[in-house]
Amino acid sequence: MNQLQQLQNPGESPPVHPFVAPLSYLLGTWRGQGEGEYPTIPSFRYGEEIRFSHSGKPVIAYTQKTWKLESGAPMHAESGYFRPRPDGSIEVVIAQSTGLVEVQKGTYNVDEQSIKLKSDLVGNASKVKEISREFELVDGKLSYVVRMSTTTNPLQPHLKAILDKL
């Protein structure tokens, strides 16, 4: 489908780009619950929704939002792009609602349906030094773990969640 056809038929999705195809299982909306911890804060639980979408280009758009389970009040949001390559490498850029930005690089494994990322750059963050993310599809559920290091704490688990596809 060319750009003119897409403009004329905006409800139709373009074909998935070949670079995106190995990760097409991510496409759609996922919702569930997660929990967070870190030595400097009290543990917490949250609701979460992640959406992965595509435009026919070699990139996956990513949006995420979280909320307090008790009240539904918004907590955190971020958005960005996943750029998979045919060799199994992937680059991810994320902008968080806190102003922090991440450039992550890593790999994806088609057979294991997993993605492993490590920060190449963490910007606009005086205390955060490194962030890693691991995503995995198990029994139709998307799980992830986010690890973080700061100026005072080594890399360790910070967030984890299990999400169901809607």
Swiss-Prot record:
Q: Which domain of life is it from?
A: Eukaryota
A molecular function (GO) term: isomerase activity
**What is the uppermost EC class here?**
isomerase
Q: In which pathway does it act?
A: Nitrogen metabolism
Looking up PANTHER family in the UniProt record yields: PEROXYNITRITE ISOMERASE THAP4, THAP4 PROTEIN
* Its biological purpose: Heme-binding protein able to scavenge peroxynitrite and to protect free L-tyrosine against peroxynitrite-mediated nitration, by acting as a peroxynitrite isomerase that converts peroxynitrite to nitrate. Therefore, this protein likely plays a role in peroxynitrite sensing and in the detoxification of reactive nitrogen and oxygen species (RNS and ROS, respectively). Is able to bind nitric oxide (NO) in vitro, but may act as a sensor of peroxynitrite levels in vivo.
Q: How is this protein named in the record?
A: Peroxynitrite isomerase Rv2717c
